[in-house]
């Protein structure tokens, strides 16, 4: 096939439509080491363990690359490493996109990562979920264009029949598991990412739903995206849709190539596939045999995949043991963390028994077309590496023919799948082979702004979604409103017409402290909702859907009118029924800011804890501490000096004192003691509460300060700590 004078020979026929394999994601010598504690002879010591060890490979553009292997092989770890979800400095090696080295930030801006769990709002419909995703990701497009894109995507994903169905959850009937997974995929491909990472996309699905999901991913790949997924035990029909396989074991590369190469790979190892047996399952069984062997491990298979050095047959191990016992042992160093570190097996037997020439029988076609040498990714072959990237096609008269690695089977080609967004390494971006290992500023500029919408635009979209969710789940808001209204009526009837006695004063103080406690405990039921929303936030912001600051502000603005209505309902009932003194507006403000403060505290705690059980425990524990030190049981002067600081940090102190000042900053008499009248000022002085008018204003400002502080802490946690990233 000739294209602008260039000869492109590496193509795959999809219903007789050639698709070039030029370009893709390449990775070199990826190593990820973690430190684990190990107990030896009763003592704990640190041990370095390689979760990934010197993995080099590639994922062709326009293809589905499946990462497979036994449990604990490092599949998800490799996926996280390629997707930039491992903290900077922890992962060693290079990742290149179309011949240019890229960092984690650049990968996130050109890719989408679909988690194994479907994190979606249950009370949004399929259309609304995808429409909000379009609003976040396709900012510059008009509303009409966004709707058209969403409608087209719904049709392509086979979701037309469930377009207006709620996503649903355990308590709400919604779409099926397969449809939910396709919605998750749609949310992350609405903007046409060049790279698509999926962690176990078929997990928990029946065979039909799993096949449907992979078919949609196949169509997405055929339109120019690089699709990389982890998968466990795919069916034979799904295997036919997988173009490129990467098989791992204990963090090492065991095999790389197409499905048809698996049998050839096993034959070169001296293993034959039994008739009718699945080649992939047979290879994984062989890997596990070596892994469970007491004398050799999967390292010999990794060496075979890397250099072509044939591993020993396990049936010949008696001969090998006899031979190695006749010579001085010199154990081969194994990578850190392997369970075979203490084995004394001498792998030099390979040179005597089963060493093969690297070029005689080893088929290097299973390797990346960008690297045709037996050694991995040396600087000397960087020029050859770049010849197969789109940016080099303009300058080469002829492209070398990479080995064929077409997948078997006939596929259905869909020309209407949304095209991938251009990567920063498209054909108009020329790369110098001398500096391709360092991402340039121009590649960053080529991508445009980091976020699709303006600050105000993001906040408005988030507010609209929040209001929609609140409208669909009125029980959370209405339950609090009903509780506060009911308790207001109860308090009004219980504390009506207090007597002008010391007991009457005590009763009125009890009313105020109960009111404060009621408002502080009323938001505890929101912990599960905030934790669920946090997981969705992590998924959406991992690839720059919106800013954490916009999310924080939108959440605050959305809840303010509902909190104000709750405070107003309670204040209006008890104020007039109990004939309270002082300005009504101040009484309302204290209650409203109390709700605002406790709401901010709850969302802050929810951003830290891993689950709602710990969230409930933490919120209740801290609220109890605030209650203990608010000044009701012991005045601020009577609290021991070493605990007095708790009175200042207790967020209940200020609304409690504020309500008392609003009621008792007066010379009116509220009772007598031994014939001496007790005025409102006397009550405040006995409780060591200020009698100045300015103290009322200061208390409100301090309460606002606590609410703002908790929101700032909430933002900091979201911005810097709530990242779905390995350390």
Curated annotation (Swiss-Prot):
Residue intervals on the Extracellular side: 497-510, 581-583, 634-699
Pfam families: ABC2_membrane, ABC2_membrane_7, ABC_tran
The keyword DNA-binding is annotated on this UniProt entry: no
Transmembrane segments: 476-496, 511-531, 560-580, 584-604, 613-633, 700-720
Compartment(s): Cell membrane
Membrane topology type: Multi-pass membrane protein
Record-level Gene Ontology MF annotations: ABC-type transporter activity; ATP binding; ATP hydrolysis activity; ATPase-coupled transmembrane transporter activity
Conditions for induction: Accumulates in root cortical cells containing arbuscules upon arbuscular mycorrhizal (AM) symbiosis with Glomus versiforme.
Glycosylated residue positions: 667
GO biological process annotation, one example: transmembrane transport
SUPFAM superfamilies: P-loop containing nucleoside triphosphate hydrolases (SSF52540)
Cytoplasmic topological intervals: 1-475, 532-559, 605-612, 721-727
Enzyme type, top EC level: translocase
EC number(s) stated in the UniProt entry for this protein: 7.6.2.-
Binding of ATP, residues: 69-76
Summary of the tissues where the protein is detected: Expressed constitutively in the vascular tissue of roots.
Keywords: ATP-binding, Cell membrane, Glycoprotein, Hydrolase, Membrane, Nucleotide-binding, Translocase, Transmembrane, Transmembrane helix, Transport
Function of the molecule: Together with STR, required for arbuscule development in arbuscular mycorrhizal symbiosis.
Record note on quaternary structure: Heterodimerizes with STR; the resulting transporter is located in the peri-arbuscular membrane.
The protein's name: ABC transporter G family member STR2
Organism, scientific name: Medicago truncatula
């Amino acid at each position: 096939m000739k294209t602008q004078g260039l000869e492109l020979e590496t193509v795959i026929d999809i219903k007789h439509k050639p698709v070039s394999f030029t370009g893709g994601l390449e990775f070199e010598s990826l190593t990820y080491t973690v430190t684990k504690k190990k107990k030896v002879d009763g003592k704990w010591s640190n041990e370095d363990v390689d979760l990934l060890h010197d993995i080099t490979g590639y994922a062709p553009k326009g293809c589905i690359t499946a990462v497979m292997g036994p449990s604990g092989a490092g599949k998800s770890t490799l996926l996280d490493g390629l997707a930039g979800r491992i903290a900077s400095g922890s992962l060693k090696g290079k990742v290149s996109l179309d011949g240019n080295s890229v960092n984690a930030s650049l990968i996130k801006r050109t890719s989408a990562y679909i988690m194994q769990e479907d994190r979606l709002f249950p009370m949004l419909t399929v259309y609304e979920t995808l429409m909000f995703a379009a609003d976040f990701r396709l900012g510059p497009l008009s509303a009409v264009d966004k709707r058209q894109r969403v409608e087209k995507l719904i049709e392509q994903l086979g979701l037309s029949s469930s377009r207006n169905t709620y996503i649903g959850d355990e308590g709400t009937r919604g779409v099926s598991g397969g449809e939910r997974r396709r919605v998750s995929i749609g949310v992350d491909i609405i903007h046409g990412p060049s790279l698509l990472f999926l962690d176990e996309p078929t997990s928990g699905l029946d065979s039909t739903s799993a096949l449907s999901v992979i078919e949609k991913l196949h169509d997405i790949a055929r339109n120019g995206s690089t699709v990389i997924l982890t998968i466990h035990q795919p069916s034979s029909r799904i295997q036919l849709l997988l173009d490129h396989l990467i098989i791992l074991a204990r963090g090492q590369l065991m095999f790389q190539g197409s499905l048809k190469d698996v049998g050839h790979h096993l034959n070169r190892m001296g293993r034959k596939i039994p008739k009718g047996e699945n080649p992939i399952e047979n290879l994984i069984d062989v890997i596990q045999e070596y892994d469970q062997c007491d004398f050799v491990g999967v390292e010999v298979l990794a060496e075979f995949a890397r250099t072509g050095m044939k591993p020993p047959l396990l049936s010949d191990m008696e001969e090998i043991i006899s031979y190695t016992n006749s010579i001085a042992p010199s154990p081969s160093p194994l990578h850190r963390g392997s369970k075979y570190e203490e084995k004394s097996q001498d792998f030099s037997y390979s040179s005597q028994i089963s060493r093969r020439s690297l070029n005689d029988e080893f088929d290097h076609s299973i390797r990346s077309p960008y690297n045709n040498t037996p050694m991995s990714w040396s600087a000397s072959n960087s020029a050859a590496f770049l010849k197969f990237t789109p940016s080099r096609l303009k300058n080469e008269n002829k492209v070398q023919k990479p080995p064929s690695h077409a997948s078997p089977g006939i596929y259905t080609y869909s020309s209407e799948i949304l095209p991938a967004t251009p990567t920063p390494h498209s054909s108009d971006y020329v790369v110098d082979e001398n500096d391709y290992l360092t991402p340039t500023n121009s590649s960053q500029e080529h991508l445009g702004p980091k976020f699709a919408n303006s600050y105000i635009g993001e906040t408005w979209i988030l507010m609209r979604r929040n209001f929609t969710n609140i409208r669909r789940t009125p029980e959370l808001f209405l339950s609090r409103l009903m509780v506060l209204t009911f308790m207001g009526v109860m308090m009004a009837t219980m504390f009506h017409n207090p007597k002008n006695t010391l007991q009457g004063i005590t009763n009125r103080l009890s009313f105020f402290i109960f009111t404060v406690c009621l408002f502080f405990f009323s938001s505890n039921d929101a912990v599960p909702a905030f934790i669920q929303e946090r997981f969705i936030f992590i998924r959406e912001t991992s690839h720059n859907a919106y800013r954490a600051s916009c999310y924080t502000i939108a959440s605050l603005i959305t809840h303010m009118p509902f909190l104000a209505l709750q405070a107003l309902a309670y204040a209006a009932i008890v104020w007039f029924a109990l004939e309270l003194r002082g300005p009504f507006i101040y009484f309302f403000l204290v209650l409203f800011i109390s709700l605002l403060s406790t709401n901010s505290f709850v969302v802050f705690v929810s951003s830290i804890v891993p689950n709602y059980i710990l969230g409930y425990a933490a919120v209740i524990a801290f609220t109890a501490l605030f209650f203990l030190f608010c000044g009701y049981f012991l005045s601020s002067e009577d609290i021991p000096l070493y605990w007095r600081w708790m009175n200042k940090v207790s967020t209940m102190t200020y609304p409690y004192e504020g309500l008392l000042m609003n009621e008792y900053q007066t010379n009116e008499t509220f009772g007598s003691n031994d014939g001496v009248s007790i005025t409102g000022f006397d009550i405040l002085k006995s409780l060591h509460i200020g009698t100045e008018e300015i103290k009322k204003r200061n208390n409100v400002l301090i309460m606002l300060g606590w609410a703002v502080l908790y929101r700032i802490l909430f933002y900091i946690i979201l911005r810097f700590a709530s990242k779905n990233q390995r350390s």
